[in-house]
């Protein structure tokens, strides 16, 4: 239990901007971080949901409301996953060989492809949030999407081999076993039940669409890079949440 709590503290300090007391990082805590990843999603989702509610009461235009609501998940996570999205887009869209793509993936400079990709992402996500406000969609979707995406990404992260260049990814997955996978599956099943209760069968449809989207992202990155990494996880998470948001606009 102590190591699980340490893993949660490490996850909060790593994946959010929430100030946390100092915790010494070690392998015992690191191997529990992925189990805690859906909890991080719950925190991000609650902040997104509450932000939606509060901003929706402001006497400002729907355009400004949409922009403010859209950036909440990026702000609370310190742009961490957005950085991974940009790095992966830069590498894949370069259309180079595998070795060069891996070099681009680790390169800290920002390329044109990543900038164009994030602009497209922002346009679509802004439009989806605008639709949420305009058509009064169920805001609980904003609470559940970050949980679902992180749960699925965490499962893939501890299941699929990490690329050798991803030292941090190996650090998180070292010492994980079948028990961690079972816990993540049970967590996803619980979320699935709750999501279904709130949204009915449409909730299950959205969950399946997000699962397929993340799975396709991971499969594409395995083909391109030979494995998974922190950047790949961030890329898959961002795309999964965007697809989930877009699906919610279409089907709810």
Swiss-Prot record:
What are its E.C. numbers? 2.7.8.26
Which controlled-vocabulary keywords does the entry list?
A: Cell membrane, Cobalamin biosynthesis, Magnesium, Membrane, Transferase, Transmembrane, Transmembrane helix
Q: Where in the cell is it found?
A: Cell membrane
* GO MF: adenosylcobinamide-GDP ribazoletransferase activity; cobalamin 5'-phosphate synthase activity
Q: Keyword Repeat on this protein? A: no
- Residues that span the membrane, as ranges: 4-24, 38-58, 60-80, 113-133, 141-161, 190-210, 232-252
Q: Which InterPro entries match?
A: CobS
The pathway noted for it is: Cofactor biosynthesis; adenosylcobalamin biosynthesis; adenosylcobalamin from cob(II)yrinate a,c-diamide: step 7/7
User: Which range is the signal sequence, renumbered to this chain?
Assistant: none
Class in the EC hierarchy, top level: transferase
Membrane topology label = Multi-pass membrane protein
A single GO cellular-component term on record: plasma membrane
The entry's function note states:
Joins adenosylcobinamide-GDP and alpha-ribazole to generate adenosylcobalamin (Ado-cobalamin). Also synthesizes adenosylcobalamin 5'-phosphate from adenosylcobinamide-GDP and alpha-ribazole 5'-phosphate.
Q: Which PANTHER family match?
A: ADENOSYLCOBINAMIDE-GDP RIBAZOLETRANSFERASE (PTHR34148:SF1)
Matches recorded under HAMAP family: CobS
Tell me what this protein is called.
Adenosylcobinamide-GDP ribazoletransferase
Q: Which gene encodes it?
A: cobS
């Amino acid at each position: 239990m102590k190591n699980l709590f340490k893993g949660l503290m490490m996850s909060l300090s790593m994946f959010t901007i929430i100030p946390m007391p100092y915790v010494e990082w070690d392998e015992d805590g690191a191997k529990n971080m992925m189990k805690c990843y859906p909890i991080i999603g719950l925190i991000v989702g609650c902040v997104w949901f509450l932000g939606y509610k509060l901003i929706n009461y402001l006497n400002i235009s729907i355009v400004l409301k949409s922009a403010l609501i859209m950036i909440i998940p990026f702000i609370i996570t310190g742009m961490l996953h957005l950085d991974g999205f940009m790095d992966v887009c830069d590498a894949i869209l370069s259309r180079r060989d595998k070795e060069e793509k891996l070099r681009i993936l680790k390169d800290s400079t920002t390329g044109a492809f990543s900038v164009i990709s994030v602009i497209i992402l922002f346009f679509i996500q802004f439009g989806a949030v605008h639709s949420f406000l305009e058509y009064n969609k169920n805001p609980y979707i904003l609470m559940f999407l970050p949980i679902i995406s992180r749960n699925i990404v965490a499962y893939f992260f501890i299941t699929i081999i990490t690329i050798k260049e991803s030292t941090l990814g190996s650090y998180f997955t070292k010492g994980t076993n079948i028990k961690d996978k079972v816990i993540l599956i049970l967590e996803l099943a619980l979320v699935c039940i709750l999501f279904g209760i709130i949204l009915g069968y449409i909730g299950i449809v959205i969950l399946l669409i997000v699962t397929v989207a993340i799975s396709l992202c991971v499969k594409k990155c395995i083909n391109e890079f030979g494995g998974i990494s922190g950047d790949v996880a961030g890329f898959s998470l961002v795309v999964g949440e965007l697809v989930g948001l877009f699906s919610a606009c279409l089907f709810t």
